[in-house]
Amino acid sequence: MKKVVVTGGCGFIGSNLINYLLKKNYFVINVDKLSYSANIYNLKNINTSKYVFVKTDINDKKIISRILKKYKPSVIYNLAAETHVDRSIDSPEPFLHSNIYGVFNILECMRYYNNKSKNKIKLIHVSTDEVYGDILDKSKRADENYPFKPSSPYAASKASADHLIKSYIRTFNFPAIISNCSNNYGPKQFPEKLIPKLILNILNNKPLPIYGKGLNSREWIHVEDHCRALEILSIKGKIGESYNIGSGKNLSNIELTKLLMKIMKNKLSTIPKKVRINFVKDRPGHDIRYALNSKKIQKKLKWKAFIKINEGLSETVDWYINNLEYFKSISKREYENRIGLKI
C-alpha cells in the first residue's frame, strides 16, 4: 500500500485530494495546523484505517521529521499555504511564514530523511499561476519557461518557494516536482474566495461585490481535474521539472458572475431582489489576466481537464445549497476588508 503525506489536507484542495487518493487505495497522512480556512468537516465522511490526521504546523521540524520516520511515505503533496491575496496585502507576514519558511522546513526534513534512507521521498509542490503575473497579450499563455513576475505578497511568497525548491533540485539533486495550477473551484472551498462568496451571497439575498469593472480574467479548473493531475505527477512526472495545470478556459469576473447567476436562477426559479452586481474599489496590484499553457502535461503525461465550466459550476452550486449549515458555522472567519465588504 502506497503511503503519502498531504499537507494542508483540511483545506479546499487538500481535502478533495485526500478523498480522491483514499478512493485509489492510498494510505494518507493528513498534516494540517487547522488555520481559519481549514475544517475537519471537509473530511467528515472518512471512515477507514488508511487515514491518519496529525494537527501540526509544517514549520514544526520535530513533528514533521517524526512523521517521515514513522510512516515512511513515498510522496509528500505540499498544499499547506496561506492563499488569500487580499489577506496578503493587509498582512504579508503569515504568508512568508507558511509559504516560504514552511516549505524550507519540509525540504530540510526530507533532505535529512532521504540522506539516511534507501527509499527516497518525492515532493509534489503545489504552486500557482500567479507567479507569472499579468499576461496582457491575449494571444499568449505562460508556459513553464515564462519568467516569474509576481504582483502580490501572496504570489511573491509562492514564487520564492518555487525558486527555493529549484535551488534544492540543482544543488542537492532533490527529488521534487513543482506544479503551477490555475484558479480552482468546486465543493468545500472557503467562502472568502470568489465563487463560493458569489453563490452564498445569492442564496442569502446579498449584493455581489466585484472588483473594478469585473474585467480581470482568470483560468478556471475544477478541483477534481487538479487532483487527478497531481496523482499523475507523482507517478509519471519527471523529477526536477515544473508542470502547468490548467483547463484553458478563461472567464472575466463579470462573465463568471453572470454565468453563476444564470445557473442559480435555473435552480432557484428566481434570483432574490437584493442580489445585484456591485462594483467595488479595485485592490492594489490587481493583475488583469492569468493564462497557462498546459501542453507539457497534456502531451508528456497524457493529462487534460475533463470537467466543463458549466457542468462543474452547476455541481458546485448544488454542493453549497446542500451544505448551508456548514457555512453558517464558519461565516465569522471570512475576510471582509476588501472584496468581502459587509454590504
PLM regions and their residue ranges:
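Residue-level recognition of oxygen-bearing side chains
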Residues: 63, 84, 94, 101, ...
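N-terminal Rossmann-like NAD(P)+-binding domain of SDR-like oxidoreductases, especially those catalyzing
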Residues: 1-184, 253, 288, 315, ...
